[in-house]
Structure formats: C-alpha cells, structure tokens
C-alpha cells in the first residue's frame, strides 16, 4: 500500500519483491559509496594546492580505475541476474488466471474453473464509499489464495496495456496477439492495488487493479459462489 508523500518503495508482499528491495538497497549502497568518493576527490582537488599538473602517464592509476569499475559491475550484475531468473521461473502453479486488457478496463478468467470470469471496472469517484480509494477501487476484485503459486496469462484485446502491482513486484505488458506469462505469490492476506502502466488512450489513468489475497478456504467458498 502506498502512502501520501512516500519516498520509498511499497512494502513487499511476495518473495520476488523482497529480493527486489534487497537489490535496490544493495545498488544504492554502491552508488552512495562511489558518489562519496568522487565528491571527496573533487573537494580535495579544489581545496589543496598539492596537485600534479604535469603528470603525463600513470599506469598504476589507470589499471586501478579500469579493474575497480569492472568489479563493481560484476557485484551489481550477479544479484540482478539471479532475480531475473527467479522472476521467469514457474513451478507447478496451483491456479491460472487469464487477464485481458481493454480500453479501459480489465477482464479476468479463472481457467481452472468452467465458468468463472468477469470484467473489472473502476468505481467512479461519486460512487465511492467512505474509506475507499479514489481511482483505485474496482467493482470486481481479483480474489486469489495466498501462499500459493499463481500463474497470470496476460494479453490485450486492442492496444498496449501493462498489468502492474507494485507491492508484488509485478509489471507485465499486455500486447495484442501475444500471451505473456508471470507468476505471483502473496505471503500475507490483504488488498493490493495496481494500475495500467502503459499509456493506452484517454482513460489510461482509470484502469486500476485490485487483488484480494485470502486464505485458501475463503477462496474455495468464494469460487463456489461465483460459479
């Protein structure tokens, strides 16, 4: 959940998002150390007269500033590649949901059930109830079981869209004629909000996504009522 004037990322709900947060902190630490070193060198050069203005060759220094950046890039690339492969991994999903983007709403189909599908439209501001979020509430939430691997198949009926839920670390393009795949797993129950993250027309800002993660027993009851 995002908060007003929030400077950091949303709290992680999935293992992938937790890894992304760790990688974010790891990368920022490296950037902070490099920036501090560069600022220190610049300030030292500006405040002291002990500088070599006639140096023509310094093999040792050139070797250091060639090898050191290479090591830093490796330290950034290794955890990044690890997370990339984790995001592409699919291990026997317990449930598959097909998501279709439209101008300007989402439709969902639970492919493991014979007739469980619905459209999800944004609730207009004038119809919101007290406590509901403007531009983020929908008439039909996507109810999913927590602590289970869920596969999302994402495509579009018309133009480019993008299905994104920040707290789960998800952002997958919805492309007409192409079926993209992503997996998700929420570690705790709750409501998780997202939006279309690809400019898709005049009502692009009015395509919210709401995932309701619930215990398996509640999901089974809900799915039985929906079917």
Swiss-Prot record:
PROSITE patterns reported in the protein's UniProt record: COX2, COX2_CUA, COX2_TM
Top-level taxon: Eukaryota
Binding-site residues for Cu cation A1, renumbered to this chain: 161, 196, 200, 207
UniProt cross-references to InterPro entries, sorted A to Z: CcO_II, CcO_II-like_C, CcO_II_C, Copper_CuA, Cupredoxin, Cyt_c_oxidase_su2, Cyt_c_oxidase_su2_TM_dom, Cyt_c_oxidase_su2_TM_sf
Binding site for Cu cation A2: 196, 198, 200, 204
Membrane topology: Multi-pass membrane protein
Modified residues (Phosphotyrosine): 218
EC number(s) stated in the UniProt entry for this protein: 7.1.1.9
GO cellular component: mitochondrial inner membrane; respiratory chain complex IV
Keywords: Copper, Electron transport, Magnesium, Membrane, Metal-binding, Mitochondrion, Mitochondrion inner membrane, Phosphoprotein, Respiratory chain, Translocase, Transmembrane, Transmembrane helix, Transport
Function, as annotated: Component of the cytochrome c oxidase, the last enzyme in the mitochondrial electron transport chain which drives oxidative phosphorylation. The respiratory chain contains 3 multisubunit complexes succinate dehydrogenase (complex II, CII), ubiquinol-cytochrome c oxidoreductase (cytochrome b-c1 complex, complex III, CIII) and cytochrome c oxidase (complex IV, CIV), that cooperate to transfer electrons derived from NADH and succinate to molecular oxygen, creating an electrochemical gradient over the inner membrane that drives transmembrane transport and the ATP synthase.
Protein name: Cytochrome c oxidase subunit 2
Quaternary structure annotation from Swiss-Prot or TrEMBL: Component of the cytochrome c oxidase (complex IV, CIV), a multisubunit enzyme composed of 14 subunits. The complex is composed of a catalytic core of 3 subunits MT-CO1, MT-CO2 and MT-CO3, encoded in the mitochondrial DNA, and 11 supernumerary subunits COX4I, COX5A, COX5B, COX6A, COX6B, COX6C, COX7A, COX7B, COX7C, COX8 and NDUFA4, which are encoded in the nuclear genome.
Positions annotated to bind Mg(2+): 198
Broad EC category: translocase
Organism of this sequence: Chrysocyon brachyurus
Reactions the enzyme catalyzes: 4 Fe(II)-[cytochrome c] + O2 + 8 H(+)(in) = 4 Fe(III)-[cytochrome c] + 2 H2O + 4 H(+)(out)
TM regions (residue ranges): 15-45, 60-87
Disulfide links within the chain: none
